[in-house]
Amino acid sequence: MTDRRNLTTNQGVPIGDNQNSMTAGLKGPTLLEDYVLIEKLAHFDRERVPERVVHARGAGAHGKFVTKKSMKKYTKAQFLQEEGTETEVFARFSTVIHGQHSPETLRDPRGFSVKFYTEEGNYDFVGNNLPVFFIRDAIKFPDVIHSLKPDPRTNIQDGNRYWDFFSLTPEATTMITYLFSDEGTPASYREIRGSSVHAFKWINEEGKTVYVKLRWVPKAGIVNLSTDQAAQIQAKEFNHASRDLYEAIENGDYPEWDLYVQVLDPKDLDNYDFNPLDATKDWFEDVFPYEHVGTMTLNRNPDNIFAETESVGFNPGVLVPGMLPSEDRVLQGRLFSYSDTQRHRVGPNYLQLPINSPKTPVDNNQRDGQMPFKQQTSSINYEPNSYDTEPKENPAYIEPEQEIRGDISGRLVAEKPNNFGHAKEVWKRYSDAERAALVKNIVDDWEGVREDIKIRNLRNFYQVEPEFAERVAAGTGINLAEHVIDLK
């Protein structure tokens, strides 16, 4: 027989009655001196933190990553040096635009983030299922998200808003061809691919730098829903993707993804009709071959969703030695924004939470702030200092010097915008069924959208491929010919 556990306050004091408040007699008011009541209500009032401004709706799981092929010729990152190296990971999948309890059937990119707890500290992979993004410069990030979020006056998402933005942002066209395919409504988190979206730099022991993009390929295959299938699921279930992931892991059907790397030598950066460091551009596999890196297996569900899935924080700038960010303009903005939002949302010491803490020692002079529950104790909280017992900088970890491309500063327009070339490639690579789904999904989404906005988008589609625009126009009853005379 086990000892009976006492219900207690947060001060550890046993509670004798958790059913009735203290009152002044049977019919009198509740007493302010009822510490149990006040503590319980006050804590309940503060149970939630601000939800993520994007990627609020998510599901996570623990697992492992096993390196299957040494990457030492590209990077000196320790966890990628030897075949068979195992690294603990936590992965979080998410929808992007809508709130924490929104349906998982909605058309939306899916976030695909993985925290690697490596022997050199944490490494964050922060990507999406779709390989490109809407914009090429972080200065437009608040605007694209505002356009996709609900109207601040009605609190209802309005196609007039985001299609207006898309029509005036031709660089978004490639993302549209992915998002409005059936890949914009995945069947489950277990059956989505993942992409770094941005290029990064890998540096090996000799100091040689290459640009890379990373891709996750699900062993279960990529499975999507049609708009009609998504609607049928949504009528019955808001949580189908979270439920599927949780139940698969509980039943021992552990989802797996293979990680691949694509490599670009910096000397070849200018050999294309687009900028490979532009987040609106894909690196197609037949041009940039995939090389297998390793396999991720998710094998344990969180014990506490709030403490783990909700409190985990990612930043694409959290890199280990042998990795650096590229000059991608969207990535450069994310390097600041992602940790900044976690400090606002969770608190300045969010990295001390177990889900965010590295497995390696943390030894520095960053102290105090709200809730510093892993406070360092040395009286020497400055550097440099003359004490041999204190942590010292290690020149072996100085980032290697990198060539800077450019000799002037200013608000310069990106080179080689090529806004429609990659969308054309995507259209060409789609099957007849995929093209039909893309057209149908756009036509359906345009219900209630102003005609002038539709026409501007059709002009963009026409510059991708006339057939693309013609089929969308036919579905909406617009006479395309009179609106594209100047484009012929």
UniProtKB/Swiss-Prot annotation:
Its cofactor is heme. GO terms for biological process: hydrogen peroxide catabolic process; response to hydrogen peroxide. Its EC number is 1.11.1.6. PANTHER family: CATALASE, CATALASE-2. The active site is at H55, N128. Residues 1-24 are annotated as: Disordered. Belongs to the catalase family. It comes from the Bacteria. One of its GO terms (molecular function) is metal ion binding. It catalyses: 2 H2O2 = O2 + 2 H2O. Residues 7-23 have a biased composition (Polar residues). Heme binds at Y338. It is an enzyme of class 1 (oxidoreductase). SMART domains: Catalase. Gene3D superfamilies: Catalase core domain. This is Catalase. One of its GO terms (cellular component) is cytoplasm. The lineage of its organism: Bacteria, Bacillati, Bacillota, Bacilli, Bacillales. The keyword Cytoplasm applies. Keywords: Cytoplasm, Heme, Hydrogen peroxide, Iron, Metal-binding, Oxidoreductase, Peroxidase. It is found in: Cytoplasm.
